[in-house]
Amino acid sequence: MEKIKVYELRNKTDAELLKQLEDLKQEYASMRVQKVTVTSTSKLSQIGVIRKAIAKVLTVYNQRKREEARKQYTKISEMPLNMRPKLTRAKRRALTPKQLHLKTIKQRKKCENFPKRKYALLV
């Protein structure tokens, strides 16, 4: 078994990915049985390669599913927590840009009645 290239996996359909995942899992199970029963280590080094291949297939499949789910939530204001961008705790609690630019009535009146003075120098 040779290493699986991720760019090749991205070209496959979901059904093909699931079929390949099933095949890899069966092969992995048979390798583990071989590891216990047979003492020769000729193909046992392939266990790591198969495990990594399974991880790659699952990664591509899950990324695709998450992208589809993200497209569904583009028009909805509330998004599930696991779909939101990963931010620090402080950034999650920070004010939104709209909230930052809001002014109180008193502050607005003060700005209207006493605008910032502009000076121009004649040269």
Swiss-Prot record:
GO molecular-function terms, A-Z: mRNA binding; structural constituent of ribosome
Keywords linked to the UniProt accession: Ribonucleoprotein, Ribosomal protein
Highest rank taxon of the organism: Eukaryota
InterPro entries linked: Ribosomal_uL29, Ribosomal_uL29_CS, Ribosomal_uL29_euk, Ribosomal_uL29_sf
Protein family membership: Belongs to the universal ribosomal protein uL29 family.
NCBIfam families: L29
Protein name per its UniProtKB record: Large ribosomal subunit protein uL29
Species annotation: Babesia bovis
Lineage: Eukaryota, Sar, Alveolata, Apicomplexa, Aconoidasida
Gene: RPL35
